[in-house]
Amino acid sequence: MKPEDIVPEFRVEAKDYARPTPVEGVRILSLTRFIDDRGFFMEIFRSRAAHDGGKPLAEFFRGVDAAQMNYSIVDADNHIKGLHYHLKQDDIWFFPPPSKAKIVLYDIRKDSPTRGATQVVVAGGGKDLLVRIPAGVAHGYRPLTNPCALLYFVTVVFDPASPDEYRVAWDHPAVRDLWEIPNG
């Protein structure tokens, strides 16, 4: 069978399963759940590896000066948090169970090899990830659960007198379609 053998209204391009090029400097670590009949346990931070199993987490945080840890909850339907970026700080995001979110990243660094690239990450809902977002990468998220919790580390203490937070419109042409939830 060929595309021409399909009724014209249903002739569309084949779904593209290619993975986009990730934004330079964004790091993602899948966390391990230790599950038994009582529930589960999961490490989300480790400053050093005391055993082989702790090496990936300790390596992920190597060189990270965690200055502040924050917790945020969105309990509004159909809401988008973002976009914003920082000049001085990196963020490390974690959506704790049962929260789930669609993270949108947009590289706006002038000299980055991935300048202008976008990346989408779905985190939470059983896909336990840490996502490290470097300074200069605009970021935001769309909750996929209500409520949706975000636990995150930052590398600079927040100063209300001199906030290191700059806005990019959530519906900027480079990202406006990335917030959608695809059907089909």
Which residues does each PLM region occupy?
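Non-catalytic, conserved peripheral segments adjacent to functional cores
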Residues: 1-126, 146-184
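Conserved metal-binding segment of the jelly-roll/cupin
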Residues: 123-145
